[in-house]
């Protein structure tokens, strides 16, 4: 559901997370004395743009749900249409936040699968979908994005940065807004938060983007420096003219994610993503051999399983190993793997489902 364990490099843990000089959620107001933090946040923005394939990113938002709600409002500001489609396969907490924001901004949200979405009335401001979705399925949304654009609607993609290290980036199939959580880039779970959300857009939407952006300029002596730019939040201009009422960010956690990407490099991130995916493939093969059915053939790190035996029995064995599964309303189980999963974890999972060892 968008939360994963991860390995925090000791260098980042000691020098960033536990260093009081970095501990603030705010983006710096005094660029003259904050060039280091601003440069790190610019690295975060650059990382998000590189991975999502979009033109511009902000310096983080509060969480993925908030980012999705901000995407809804951006779509409404862009074309003034009051209907917004949401794919029901988005994470449930994201859907809940979007519906709450829509209720109080006068936007009608409709939960529809892509095949059910009708853009012919040209009254839809945008569409939000999850890639990969909350059940783990990886789907090609190119056709949906094209249909949305033909009617003047915007396409918003809630996604996973680690998955995008090996999947096709949203920018390549026409998405206008990409958003999600950067938590699994070296930020501990923290019992559910706080985590930094990312938000990236096409160049034509930059001036409508919520949150803060770090830009490059020159000082009085002509030296290249960093500063906050395009500050159209309500702290800086009249409330009714503001692009967003979000007045803070998650700067510390965004800096951790940026440093995680720098620490590993592009090849290192791809290696982590492939390792996670390979572990998921091993688990999926073991489950199928034991008679369990997978709901989706294309996935990255998450499986939805129709058990070939008693679900209660499986959950009982999982409790013995202190492993928590997601129980769907239809009785299927969800499992997500992450970079901390090792061979013993896979063996435990296979034992829980009555399968043979991964060895």
Per-range role (PLM):
Residues 1-43, 49, 237-238, 359:
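N-terminal entrance/gating region of PLP-dependent enzymes' catalytic architecture
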Residues 10-11, 142, 146, 343-359:
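Flexible inter-domain linker/hinge segments
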Residues 19-31, 47-53, 79-81, 109, ...:
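Gly-rich Lys/Arg/Thr-decorated short loops/hinges at beta-loop-alpha junctions or inter-strand turns
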Residues 29-33, 50-69:
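Short loop-beta-helix segment that forms the pyridoxal 5′-phosphate
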Residues 290-319, 337-340:
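Conserved PLP-binding catalytic core of the aspartate aminotransferase-like
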Residues 317-321, 326-355:
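Noncatalytic alpha-helical scaffolds and linker/capping helices
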């Amino acid at each position: 559901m968008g939360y994963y364990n991860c390995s925090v490099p000791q260098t980042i843990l000691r020098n960033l997370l536990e260093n009081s000089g970095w501990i603030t959620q705010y983006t710096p107001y005094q660029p003259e004395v904050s060039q280091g933090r601003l440069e790190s946040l610019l690295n975060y923005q650059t990382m998000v743009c590189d991975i999502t394939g979009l033109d511009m990113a902000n310096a983080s938002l509060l969480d993925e749900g908030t980012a999705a709600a901000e995407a809804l409002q951006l779509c409404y500001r862009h074309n003034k249409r009051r209907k917004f489609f949401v794919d029901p396969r988005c994470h449930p907490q994201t859907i809940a936040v979007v519906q709450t924001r829509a209720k109080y901004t006068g936007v009608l949200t409709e939960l529809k699968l892509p095949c059910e979405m009708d853009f012919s009335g040209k009254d839809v401001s945008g569409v939000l979908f999850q890639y990969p979705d909350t059940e783990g399925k990886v789907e090609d949304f190119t056709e949906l994005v094209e249909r949305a654009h033909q009617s003047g609607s915007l396409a918003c993609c809630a996604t996973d940065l680690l998955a995008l290290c090996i999947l096709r980036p949203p920018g390549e199939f026409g998405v206008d807004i990409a958003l999600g959580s950067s938590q699994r880039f070296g930020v501990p779970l923290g019992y559910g938060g706080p985590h930094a959300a990312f938000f990236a857009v096409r160049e034509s939407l930059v001036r409508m983007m919520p949150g803060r952006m770090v830009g490059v300029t020159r000082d009085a002596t002509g030296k290249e420096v960093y500063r906050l730019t395009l500050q159209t939040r309500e702290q800086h201009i009249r409330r009714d003219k503001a692009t967003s009422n979000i007045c803070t960010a998650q700067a510390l956690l965004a800096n951790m994610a940026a440093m995680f990407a720098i620490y590993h490099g592009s090849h290192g991130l791809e290696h982590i993503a492939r390792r996670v995916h390979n572990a998921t493939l091993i688990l999926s093969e073991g489950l199928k051999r034991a008679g369990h059915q997978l709901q989706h053939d294309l996935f990255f790190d998450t499986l939805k399983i129709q058990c070939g035996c008693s679900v209660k029995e499986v959950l009982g064995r999982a409790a013995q190993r202190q492993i928590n599964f997601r129980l769907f309303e239809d009785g299927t189980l969800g499992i997500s793997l992450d970079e901390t999963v090792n061979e013993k974890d896979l063996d435990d999972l296979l034992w829980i489902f009555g399968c043979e060892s991964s060895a």
